[in-house]
């Protein structure tokens, strides 16, 4: 890919793999080995220097609604409430308020945040913020979920709960997930 200075960066080389629909792929490696670069290419945030990446039969050339991203840090809009953060993508798609309200409530219950909808996200713990980020991703029903070390900043107990939640959601939804981590335990 090209760096902000226009220099070519070879973070990945001779990489070729296929992920079947409904699989959960964990990419494990030390810091700096290209894990996040792989995810950023899959998300369409950066273009590969050579080669292609496809989702279904479509080449990925930029961000798209068919992919959802959960970052290491929640990347939430701190000035918005939990409901407003989770509903953000639906609002951008101009989903009807009645439908979006029901979907938000459903996903907040799934991620264990029922009753926190009107809470500003800056008042939440790190684990709760990650659950908001997960709900915000999943409510848009992406074909592919990209998770960039989403558990890395959490304490051990919260990390274990989030691991269980991610596995439960994966099993129940059948979504395809790529999870990036540097932790063998994850």
List where the protein language model places each region.
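Conserved signature/switch motifs of ABC ATPase nucleotide-binding domains
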Residues: 119-122, 140
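Hydrophobic anchor residue at the start of the ABC signature
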Residues: 134
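Catalytic Walker B motif of ABC-type/P-loop ATPase nucleotide-binding domains
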Residues: 145-148
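Conserved ABC ATPase "signature" region
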Residues: 87, 98-116, 167-168
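The feature captures the beta-strand-to-loop junction immediately N-terminal to the Walker
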Residues: 28-30
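Helix-to-loop junction immediately C-terminal to a conserved catalytic motif
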Residues: 43
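Conserved ABC transporter NBD signature motif
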Residues: 51-63
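Short coil-to-helix segment of the ABC ATPase nucleotide-binding domain corresponding to the Q-loop/switch region
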Residues: 80-87
């Amino acid at each position: 890919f090209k760096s902000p200075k226009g220099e070519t960066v070879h973070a990945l080389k001779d990489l070729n793999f296929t992920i079947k629909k409904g699989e959960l792929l964990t990419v494990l490696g030390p810091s700096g080995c290209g894990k996040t670069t792989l995810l950023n290419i899959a998300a369409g945030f950066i273009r590969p220097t050579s080669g292609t990446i496809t989702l279904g039969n479509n080449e990925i050339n930029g961000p798209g609604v068919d992919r959802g991203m959960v970052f290491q840090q929640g990347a939430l809009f701190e000035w918005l409430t939990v409901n407003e953060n989770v509903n953000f993508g639906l609002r951008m798609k101009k989903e009807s308020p009645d439908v979006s309200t029901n979907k938000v409530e459903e996903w907040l219950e799934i991620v264990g945040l029922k009753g926190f909808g009107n809470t500003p996200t800056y008042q939440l713990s790190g684990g709760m913020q990650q659950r908001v980020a997960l709900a915000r991703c999943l409510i848009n029903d992406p074909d592919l979920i990209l998770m960039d070390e989403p558990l890395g900043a959490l304490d051990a107990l919260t990390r274990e709960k989030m691991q269980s939640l991610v596995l439960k959601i994966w099993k129940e939804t059948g979504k395809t997930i790529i999870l990036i981590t540097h932790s063998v335990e994850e």
